[in-house]
Design a protein with these regions (language model features):
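Short, flexible loop/turn elements at secondary-structure junctions
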Residues: 83-88, 120, 210-212
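Active-site-proximal structural scaffolding
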Residues: 44, 74-78, 105-109, 164, ...
Length: 217
């Protein structure tokens, strides 16, 4: 409640509330996202909401249907969070619940793609290398738009953690660029009238000169 009251007061009293709120955030924590911030983070983490928002804003498409994610096409096309590397396949190679660290990596948000509901129902547990190869053939730009590494070696299950490392870097870089653009503010310079200059008086940058022209009439 105290932080909320402070933020509301900032909005009400500041001539530039957006910049003022950004300053408050910057003082409390860094605005930069690092690849390590994604490690072991599941879809409940705020970074996933930010990723989803960013992907929709840049025109990302469903990997299976090619439909733009930001279009509302009815209940069958509601957006869902799909494992790129199916959990059933990861579990077979040691990423099950018996190993908490590995399990967290299997559920990491960087192992998620945004698909429409109808696409998610048909994908099942296809190996990532087969699925992503098919996606690249049908929709060449789809992987890039969802910040998915393009190196096919990373799609093999034995290279799963290399895939995570690479996608963390891609997401961190692109989200930072995105945040920088939406948080950048331009300083507005108000025009100064001649009357204001005269009222201000002379200074190091302004000197009044007397004129040699006289109206003798």
């Amino acid at each position: 409640p105290q932080k909320l009251d402070r933020d509301l007061r900032t909005v009400a009293e500041s001539p530039q509330p957006f910049d003022a709120l950004l300053q408050v955030i910057a003082e409390e924590s860094r605005l930069e996202i690092l690849p390590i911030d994604f490690v072991g983070r599941a879809i409940q983490h705020p970074l996933f909401s930010m990723m989803r928002w960013y992907l929709k804003s840049r025109g990302a498409v469903c990997l299976t249907t090619g439909m733009t994610l930001r279009r509302n096409m009815g209940s069958k096309y509601q957006l869902e969070r799909d494992h790129i590397f199916p959990y059933s396949k990861l579990k077979e190679v040691g990423y099950g619940e018996s190993n908490r660290v590995k399990y967290a990596l299997a559920q990491e948000l960087t192992n998620r793609a945004i698909l429409t509901q109808v696409a998610n129902r048909t994908k099942s547990d296809t190996h990532a290398v087969d699925y992503l190869t098919s996606v690249k053939a049908k929709f060449p730009k789809a992987l890039e738009l969802q910040c998915i590494p393009d190196d096919q070696n990373h799609w093999k299950i034995e290279n799963y953690e290399l895939f995570l490392d690479e996608r963390r870097k891609i997401l961190a870089n692109q989200l930072n660029d995105f945040l920088e653009k939406i948080t950048a503010s331009e300083e507005t310079v108000a025009p100064v009238s001649l009357v204001d200059l005269i009222a201000e008086g002379e200074s190091d940058e302004l000197e009044f000169k007397s004129t040699l022209r006289w109206d003798l009439k």
